[in-house]
Amino acid sequence: MVIGLVIFVSVAAAIVGVLSNVLDMLMYVEENNEEDARIKEEQELLLLY
């Protein structure tokens, strides 16, 4: 009984850890895309002058 509970808790913790890592990756990629778009806009503006 106790062993089953320990296994369940460890599996749940692993799933939560993986999900949080995936969310962090998605947010990091989104931030990078926004920065890249901003840099491209700045470069285009500089080319216009």
Curated annotation (Swiss-Prot):
The keyword Transmembrane applies. Its main location: virion. Residues 23-49 are intravirion. It comes from the Viruses. It is a single-pass type II membrane protein. It is found in: Virion membrane; Host membrane. Residues 1 are virion surface. Induction: Expressed in the late phase of the viral replicative cycle. The keyword Glycoprotein does not apply. One of its GO terms (cellular component) is host cell membrane. The chain crosses the membrane at residues 2-22. Belongs to the orthopoxvirus OPG058 family. This is Protein OPG059. It comes from Vaccinia virus (strain Western Reserve).
